[in-house]
Structures are given as structure tokens and as C-alpha cells.
Amino acid sequence: MRVIFAGTPEFARVALERLLTAGFTVPLVLTQPDRPAGRGMKLQASPVKQCALQHGIAVAQPLSLRLDGKYPEDAAAAKAAIEAAQADVMVVAAYGLILPQWVLNTPRLGCLNIHASLLPRWRGAAPIHRAIEAGDAETGVTIMQMDAGLDTGDMLLLEKTAISPADTTATLHDRLAQLGGRLIVEALEMAACGGLKPTPQPAEGVTYAHKIDKAESTIDWNQPAEVIARRVRAFDPFPGAATTLGADAIKVWSCEIDSCSRTLDAACGQILSIDADGIGVACGAGSLLRLTVLQRAGGKRLPAADFLRGFPLAPGMVLGAAP
């Protein structure tokens, strides 16, 4: 079976590697254009492009696939490459470009998407972050037959995984990437013998995982500790849950909900205790959060005890207050 692969980040690279290991022929890879990255802001190829080049696979990096859009020459060149590949199917994983109908129609078996949620819950750009942020007990991967809608196509395969209280977006991402790679191989093997049975998504339970905005990273200490703790986990590694002390920026990478209720006369964001277990901070609804791993601007992630050696804090100080 000839497979065109369209994807960009690490999540997609894992799936591409699994397809190649399973013996599928991949004549063409589509991925986002190289972007500036790192401290030197040098152009950097996506993980998928790096993988493709290592395996000698042709790579196309169009700015758009819309023939009537802003970059028609890019789209026309991509169309020629896609048609020349004579693929049976296209596999799409976190590609980052909208696929026009002509793309969906070109491969014999259409386009299959690896989506990191249990559809129809968390359609959209950030399903892993949003599942953790919402406190979901489980998530998973859905292999979907793509149509013109936003993650609305028929489901082909689905597998669940539990979200543990310790999971961050980083850990859950890695687990789902492996699951997605395994499921897409299974789906293509089933498709080769006509064994896939499309199931329409249910009309109930639709939610949208909107793209993460960096502005969301600011911790609102008026929220209950449980809500803040979920956001800390959801925003690791990006964009990181952030607060301030005066003019100094601080990121919180790990925390624990303290079972001891705080005194209600303490201001939300006020530091109530500092000990070997971390920094106790007053939160909304009379709750208490213990910060255990922190980072100051330009520094490294540090356990609370090490962080405090270079950034002294004291009970009574208020995090997130205007300087």
C-alpha cells in the first residue's frame, strides 16, 4: 500500500516511523515549512521532515493547499506531487494545514486522521491539553476518515487510555503518540483487506479543544486549587503555568493540592507556609496549593527547596499581585 504522510510535530513523527517499520511504502511526506527556533532563531526542520530525509523520502512543504488561496503556486506544486505519488491513502497527523476537498478526493481510500482524543469529545487543535485541563479521567486516540468538517468524519478505530493524576501534557502526549502509531498501522492493514467499518460520530458529547493561547498561562489564584493544579499539568511543557512576584516572572511546573483548608481571611495568592514539602499558597474556595517545582525567568526548573535558595520567598508575600 502506498501512503502519503502529512504531519509536522513529534506526535506525527512517531506515526511515520511506525508506518515505515511496518513496511508501508511512503513516496511523499507533507509537512509545515521550516520555522525559526531556539535561542539563535535558526530555521529548523520539523520532526517529520527530519524523519523523512533520514529515510530518503521526498518532502513537500507548501504554505497552503488551497488552489484559489494566497499561495496558488505552492498549492499547484503540491497537487502535482500528490497526484504523481499515486497513493492509495493519505495519513494525516497534526499537520497544521486545512485539507481542501481535492486533497481528500485524490487518494483511492481518502485521508485518514490520527486524532488524540475520543471523538466527538475534544475536536480541534489542543485535545491533549484540554482533556487534562478539564479533569477527564480518560482519553485516547481515534482514527477517523476525514471529511470537509473539523474532525467530524466517521470513526474507524478508537482506543482509550486512562489519564493519571500525575499526567502532564508531555507524558500523555508521548503515550498517545505511541498509541496513534500502533492504531494507524492496524487501520491500514484492515483497510487493505476491506475490514474497516466506518461509524458516524454521535451527535451528543461534542466539545472543542481550542488552540492554546499563551495568555492562558497566567495563574488565577482565585480559582480552586484543584483547577489550578490541572492547568499546571495541562500547560506542561507549553506554555507553562505562570505567576509573578512583583516584577519577577515565575513558572510553576509541579504542585500538590494540600488537604488542609486555609484560613479564609488570607488573600488568594498569598504565601502561607514554606517548608521541606514546598510553598503553600492560598487559592479560591478556601483551598491550599503546595508548589513543588518552580522556575524563574532565564533559569531552570528546580525543586522548591533549591528554588528558594536563589529566590527567597516568605509567608505573607502575595503571588500574582500587581507590582
Curated annotation (Swiss-Prot):
Catalytic activity from the UniProt record: L-methionyl-tRNA(fMet) + (6R)-10-formyltetrahydrofolate = N-formyl-L-methionyl-tRNA(fMet) + (6S)-5,6,7,8-tetrahydrofolate + H(+)
Record-listed (6S)-5,6,7,8-tetrahydrofolate binding positions: S117, L118, L119, P120
InterPro entries named among the record's database cross-references: Fmt, Formyl_trans_C, Formyl_trans_C_sf, Formyl_transf_N, Formyl_transf_N_sf, Formyl_transferase-like_C_sf, GART_AS, Met-tRNA-FMT_C
Keywords from the UniProt entry: Protein biosynthesis, Transferase
Enzyme class: transferase
GO cellular component labels: cytosol
EC numbers for this chain: 2.1.2.9
Name of the protein described by the UniProt record: Methionyl-tRNA formyltransferase
Gene name in the database record: fmt
